[in-house]
Amino acid sequence: MNAGAVVVIGGTGGLGREIAKHYLDRGREVVLSGRDLARAAAVATELGGKSRGIALDLTRPHEIGAALAGIGPVDHLVLSGIDRGANTVDDYDVVQGVSLATQKLVGYVEVVHALRPRLSDTSSILVFGGQARLRPYPGSTMVSTVNGGVIGMVRTLSVELAPVRVNSIHPGIVGDSPFWADKPAQVLEAFRSGTLTGALATMADVVGATTFLLENPSVNGVDLAVDGGWR
């Protein structure tokens, strides 16, 4: 029996929402977070089941502990909340850069710190990175840097928190995600032609990989790409 909740940080949209839905459909208790309480509560109501929405802003790490205070035992923790956006060196936006680094590095670790007493020896953590760490593009310096930092985070957390398992997932282009689905067909085709499978990853593919990393008791300290062999 699973005694604890599944906590999805960044669970109000996109992949985080799909992960929350997956576990709710299987009767699990799910706590999903978003920056706006009303939106998080509305998504939780829409998804139904044993779901609850909370407000949590990763860019305000000193407030994270209080935001998570009402959560009990945790079986699985998914850290998927992130902002996108180009930030070129020529027009570097320091505020945007600090915000992104705070979210994905300081904020993620503070969530783990706040929930540490509620993790059991069989709990697991999944950290979302991304393939910009290996496939940079103009304006991706900060995104590529923090996604690379996720690898170091997983390495250290898996040692420090053992036997709690910690893994990361690095999706490529997820063709049916809200971010990519409305992009021009020629753009998606260019990415598709660069994969060894000849297909873009789907949200279902990422959810399947997520459950594998969260639930397989022998998988730990792994950084998994889900990108169809993007080259």
Annotated model-derived regions:
Residues 26-42:
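Conserved glycine-rich Rossmann-like NAD(P)H-binding loop of the short-chain dehydrogenase/reductase
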Residues 90-91, 97-111, 121-162, 173-175:
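Catalytic loop of short-chain dehydrogenase/reductase
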